[in-house]
């Protein structure tokens, strides 16, 4: 963030093959955002089970009895299917949702959107989420796209276009990261 509290990187991408640390990177960013910055985060995935898996991993961090200092930060953890959410006493929160045309409705004050499995992300899904962000009063936002390299016939052109834009002509507020085996 800059001196005024705005994100210096507003669009970031991470493309790595499976089992290469993508979720650990996301969990670190989400944990930091909630605990330190009090951010309201929307974590989206292409399937319910993927969103649920990410929720369960992050929820374990906030319920681990070996870390009472983290337990003390928690206001509420909602485990209801389709309404998974972690809320902190400092106002930070994260909600998990499978993507659809209506998936982002009802989320207020979101400053960070995580598009997990973004190789499956479609223009319609982005449009639905961006409409929610446009109504947000935070004044600042960050979008993070994470996924594996798209396979042939993959429905999500958004991730591919985002990567191309960041590598060919990166904007001042763009970041793109990827790693894989050479060759």
Show where each model-derived region lies:
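Phosphate/NTP-binding elements of NTP-utilizing enzymes
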Residues: 1-183
């Amino acid at each position: 963030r800059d001196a005024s509290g705005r994100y210096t990187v507003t669009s970031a991408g991470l493309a790595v093959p499976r089992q290469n640390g993508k979720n650990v990177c996301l969990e670190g960013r989400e944990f930091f955002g909630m605990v330190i910055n009090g951010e309201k985060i929307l974590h989206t995935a292409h399937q319910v089970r993927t969103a649920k898996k990410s929720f369960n991993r992050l929820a374990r961090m906030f319920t681990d009895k070996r870390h009472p200092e983290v337990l003390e930060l928690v206001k509420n953890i909602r485990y209801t299917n389709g309404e998974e959410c972690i809320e902190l006493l400092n106002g930070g929160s994260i909600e998990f949702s499978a993507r659809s045309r209506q998936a982002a409705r009802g989320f207020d004050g979101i400053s960070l959107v995580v598009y997990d499995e973004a190789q499956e992300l479609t223009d319609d899904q982005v449009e639905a989420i961006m409409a929610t962000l446009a109504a947000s009063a935070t004044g600042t936002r960050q979008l993070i796209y994470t996924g594996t390299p798209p396979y042939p016939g993959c429905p999500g052109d958004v991730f591919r276009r985002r990567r191309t834009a960041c590598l060919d002509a990166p904007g001042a507020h763009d970041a793109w990261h990827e790693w894989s085996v050479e060759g």
